Amino acid sequence: MSKLGSLVRERILILDGAMGTMIQQYNLTEGDFRGERFSQIPGQMKGNNDLLCLTRPDVIQDIHRKYLAAGADIIETNTFSSTRVSMADYHVQDYVREMNLAAVRLARKVADEFTSLTPDKPRFVAGSVGPTNKTCSMSPDVNNPAFRALSYDELADAYREQMEALLEGGVDALLIETIFDTLNAKAAIFAAGQAMETVGVHVPLMLSVTVSDIGGRTLSGQTLDAFLASVQHADIFSVGLNCSFGAHQLKPFLEQLAARAPYYISAYPNAGLPNSLGTYDQTPADMAHEVKEYIHEGLVNIIGGCCGTTDAYIAEYSSLIAGATPHQPVPRPENLWLSGLELLEVKPENNFVNVGERCNVAGSRKFLRLINEKKYDEALSIARRQVEDGAQVIDINMDDGLLDARTEMTTFLHLIASEPEIARVPVMIDSSKWEVIVAGLKCLQGKSIVNSISLKEGEDKFLEHARTVKRYGAAAVVMAFDEKGQADTYERKIEVCERAYRLLVDKAGFNPHDIIFDPNVLAVATGMDEHNNYAVDFIRAAGWIRKNLPGAHVSGGVSNLSFSFRGNNYIREAMHAVFLYYAIREGMDMGIVNPAASVLYTDIPADILERIEDVVLNRRPDAAERLIETAERLKAEAEAAKTSGGERQAAAHSQLAWREGTSVEERLKYALTKGIGDYLEEDLAEALKLYPKAVSIIEGPLMAGMNHVGDLFGAGKMFLPQVVKTARTMKRAVAILQPVIESEKEEGATAAGKVLLATVKGDVHDIGKNIVSVVMACNGYEIIDLGVMVPAETIVQHAIEEKVDMIGLSGLITPSLDEMVHVAIELEKAGLDVPLLIGGATTSPLHTALKIAPVYHAPVIHLKDASQNATVAAKLMNPKTKEELEEELHEKYRQLCEKNREKQVTTVSLEEARKNKLNLF
């Protein structure tokens, strides 16, 4: 471990402040920047601060000395813009190596002087590596979104040139800072690895990102969680935040980073926010007061300053950190992290990750035609529709003999980057050509999936590909394929997968969670007996992999299974539903599917289900013949209807059978479950005649339908794309009822109370919250809806400003649980006394009792669904019933906590366990 590495564990370290702000105090002229040496170079040179390392080294050395005298442990080299890319603007790009070497020499000399004076307080030099003035993720031309002013390779080469000089000069660490585009940062990380190998020196790698807005995203659109996933492959020493805001505004994002990043945490905020003249008014004492919270709450290991800060600001830190406990990094995630603009964390409770299959020129004739004809807008609409239908990852394949696959992959990925609705999900780069995969990896700022690598060409090529995937920061699909060919039996599948796993983990240093095995979904019912057990072998292999290869995932191209039934979409989709039902139960947690598929396992008629299961599970020797008979019968019935001119009528009759002889409640439930919105107006009009108020329909049959969907999803009989369709249908139903709800409100009626609603930060799901909003409004409450992805500080701010009577927090995903706890803590800190209503798919009474209620003194109530909100709210608005409710909650939560404690396994020390060992002899 480096000296820097051991010291950061012992105490909080101080980083220096702004270089540019300090330089401004010297009132340097154009002549100072140019010196005699650069007097003939065209253009203005003033403002090129890095050049001062060559023309006014005395100034730079003096600034370093002031920061070290102020107490800094780490000073940065004056090389923020010292790359060939940035220096080209000043026509001095050919001097970047000399500039970097000079910058290190200046910083190193002063740092070593101070270390010799105080050996117990060693001083370090970090090589500053800025983001450059170009971006790899965005086009500078709004009319050409596929264009890039700079390629990944050009940027990586420029970074490597800079870093080699910094390492040769003797820096103690490399600091890639002010990251606004994660793809730029990934190029810098890639270059850092190359530079360290070339120079033969390995130093800690520090990253510092900057957020561009109060939503906490980078300029290129990523959330902080997505950023962490994108750089997870790197050997990171620290990660942090700089620039953007002052210490107060930066704190919520720092808290998020500290809670999620398994690294040391750094922060160097600006001196507050700039005034109208672009200067900073915050005093050193005021900034120190805000930074003090970072230190007291254990958020940081390294603290410094950015824009507007000087040595006077840094001098305030020594007294703040004296005796303070440094931040303890959180454990590394035990799940697969993927990202586009947002994080996709693949957890067991995710059930199944849908990889959209339609952006594949080999599998979609329509997509191939659009790419061939350069109709990229229409091709993008296919990707967008898949995301809307619930695809959590988008598979992209451009392998066609008449296409330049590398160019098309690059173009399409560049175009996706300009479409936030698509770019928010991770990408699976799918190609049989390695150069196409590498080209794709250079286009994506998020953490993608490579599809695929295998042992087909032997171990050496396999390891070479695996190391390349890792270096670019991606996960990998590993095909069950080796030198002998495709693994088609259970025994061969587990043999190849185990061998590949050991090579990846033991020799390539691959994160086990980034390994996604594809044990080969092969066609069944082909008429060849040796194919009959293909599905069973896959399902068994999936179970074996999940039990025996820790961390690894299982995926597959599901449509391959039903290849024998091309042309019969119903049978194919039904086969897929059956296969997934059994494969997911065994451990398959990802698959390339059509997210718009509509056949549910539970809706397959019993006779057809039996025959499909006979085939998929290989339960009888004549299974294929029997399913073929069924498929032919269905086809013949369709042909007969067509011949008699009644095809459309027959199809319509079949599709509308659910509407015959059923109650309006049953029809609404079915419509929600299937995501059918065509008859909502008709059915809701009928329901309005039966129910006293429109809100009663929401609380009754519509809520019953939503609960049924939840049950199916939880049982693995319904998947996310279908749930998304349900949510859209529910929104449409509520929108239809909304005018009626408004008209039913009594004129002049005063509000029963004021309710603030929000889906917590990190969660984009709003269907549950929207239903609660409607129900509460119908019951006379004034609603303040803050929307989705709402930070804790925004909730606190609006709760105070609006003087609300209660706050409702919603969340659908697991990370929302931790964020709800965080919101409760912030409400408590702010001194609020407002009841907190908790709801959402992942919430529970037990989590509320154990985690949320203990950190907030006001009532915290978990609500199962929207129908309970109005009743509970009414009790909270009445002082007498509120007191009774609080007593009920206290007793209920006490019992829940007690039962939970009884379930916990009591552990003993290792020494005591050894004393209790079973003695057989």
Model-derived features: positions:
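Domain-level signal for soluble alpha/beta catalytic cores
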Residues: 1-921
